[in-house]
UniProtKB/Swiss-Prot annotation:
GO terms for molecular function: hydroxymethylbilane synthase activity. Its cofactor is dipyrromethane. Belongs to the HMBS family. Keywords: Chlorophyll biosynthesis, Porphyrin biosynthesis, Transferase. The porphobilinogen subunits are added to the dipyrromethane group. PANTHER family: PORPHOBILINOGEN DEAMINASE. This is Porphobilinogen deaminase. Its EC number is 2.5.1.61. One of its GO terms (cellular component) is cytoplasm. It comes from Prochlorococcus marinus (strain SARG / CCMP1375 / SS120). Pathway: Porphyrin-containing compound metabolism; protoporphyrin-IX biosynthesis; coproporphyrinogen-III from 5-aminolevulinate: step 2/4; Porphyrin-containing compound metabolism; chlorophyll biosynthesis. The modification S-(dipyrrolylmethanemethyl)cysteine is found at residue 245.
Length: 315
C-alpha cells in the first residue's frame, strides 16, 4: 500500500516551528500526493527555564518527547536542530537525513551601547550571556576579563533581556538568528580561531523509525551530501569522547576536494585548559576521521578534563 501521510513531531518553540515548517514545505513539493502534518510539543528542555542546561544534565533534553511519539507510532519523523540530537539514539530509531547546513558560526549580538565594540575589545567586566558550556569555556580562555552569565529562554526572550540591559552582549548561533529573521542583529561572526561551533550546529537532523524504507526514501530528498559528511565526522568525534550536548566540546569542519578537514577541541569550564587539534582524511570516511581526532585529543588529556566536568555534574 502506497504511503499517504507523514506525521512530523516537532518542538513547539518558534525556531523549531520555523525549521519544521520548512521541512514540511519541502516534502510537500517533492511528494504532493502525501498528506504531511505536524504535531508540536514541549520538551523537558523547553519546560525547565530556571536551571542552567548543564545542571539539568540530560543528553536528550530537547528530543526525548519527540522520539517517544515515533516509538509509539504517533509520528513518522522528528525534526531536530542537529546540535541537540544525542549521538546515541533510542533502539529502533535512526538519523535518516541531514539537511543543507546554514553558517554554523557563533554570533556576537550586542546591546546598542556596545555597537562600536567587537568581541576582542569589549571593556573588561562586560556581561556576556550564554547558556552553552562550550562557548563559555572557549571565551573564558581567550577573554578572562569578561563576566559570563547564564541566559535561558527562546531567542526573542533572550534578545529582550539583552536590549533591556540585563546583558551587554549575547553569544547565539548565527543560523538560528537568520532562520528567525534576526540576521540584522548579528554584530560579529565569531572566528573559529576563537570559538569552535557545536557538533551539527546549523544543520537539521531528521530522525525516523528504522526499517521504514518508504519514509526514508521520502526524507532523503532533503539530504545534503557535503553537510552530511561534515556532520557525521563531527558526531563521531563527539560520540568517541562520550560527550553530550552540554559539554565544552567544539568542532570545525570543511571539505576541500576529496579531503575532509576536522578540527576539534575540549576545554575545562574555567577555560584554563584547552586542547585542540586537527585531522584530515578521505571525505568518504568521515566517521573514521572523527574517531581518530577524538583519540588524538584523548592522548593529550581530553578525558581527564571531561571527567572533572562529569564528576561536577553528578555531584
Amino acid at each position: 500500500m502506497a504511503l499517504d501521510q507523514v506525521r512530523i513531531a516537532s518542538r513547539r518553540s518558534q525556531l523549531a516551528m520555523v525549521q519544521t515548517n520548512w521541512v514540511k514545505e519541502e516534502l510537500e513539493k517533492a511528494c504532493p500526493s502525501i498528506d504531511i502534518s505536524i504535531e508540536a510539543m514541549a520538551t523537558q528542555g523547553d519546560k525547565i527555564l530556571d536551571v542552567a542546561l548543564a545542571k539539568i544534565g540530560d543528553k536528550g533534553l530537547f528530543t526525548k518527547e519527540l522520539e517517544a511519539q515515533m516509538l509509539i507510532g504517533r509520528a513518522d519523523i522528528a525534526v531536530h536542530s542537529l546540535k541537540d540530537l544525542p549521538t546515541n539514539l533510542p533502539e529502533g530509531l535512526m538519523l535518516g537525513c541531514i539537511t543543507k547546513r546554514e553558517d554554523p558560526a557563533d554570533a556576537l549580538v550586542v546591546n546598542k551601547k556596545y555597537k562600536n565594540y567587537q568581541l576582542n575589545d569589549l571593556p573588561e567586566g562586560s556581561v556576556v550571556g550564554t547558556s552553552s558550556l562550550r562557548r563559555l569555556a572557549q571565551l573564558r580562555h581567550h577573554y578572562p576579563g569578561l563576566i559570563f552569565k547564564d541566559v535561558r529562554g527562546n531567542v526573542i526572550t533572550r534578545l529582550e533581556k539583552l536590549d533591556s540591559g540585563e546583558y551587554d552582549c549575547l553569544i547565539l548561533a548565527a543560523a538560528g538568528l537568520t532562520r528567525l529573521g534576526f540576521g540584522n542583529r548579528i554584530h560579529q561572526l565569531i572566528p573559529s580561531e576563537i570559538s569552535l561551533h557545536a557538533v551539527g550546529q546549523g544543520a537539521l537532523g531528521i530522525e525516523c523509525v528504522k526499517d521504514k524504507e518508504e519514509i526514508l526514501q521520502i526524507i532523503k530528498v532533503l539530504e545534503h551530501k557535503e553537510s552530511s559528511l561534515r556532520c557525521l565526522a563531527e558526531r563521531a568525534f563527539l560520540k568517541e569522547l562520550e560527550g553530550g550536548c552540554q559539554v565544552p566540546i567544539g568542532v570545525n569542519s570543511k571539505i576541500q576536494g576529496q579531503e575532509l578537514i576536522l578540527t576539534g577541541m575540549v576545554a575545562s569550564l574555567d577555560g584554563k585548559q584547552l586542547i585542540r587539534d586537527t585531522k584530515t582524511g578521505s571525505s568518504m570516511h568521515p566517521e573514521t576521521i572523527g574517531i581518530e581526532l577524538a583519540n588524538t585529543l584523548k592522548s593529550q588529556g581530553a578525558m581527564e578534563i571531561l571527567e572533572v566536568i562529569f564528576k561536577e555534574a553528578r555531584a
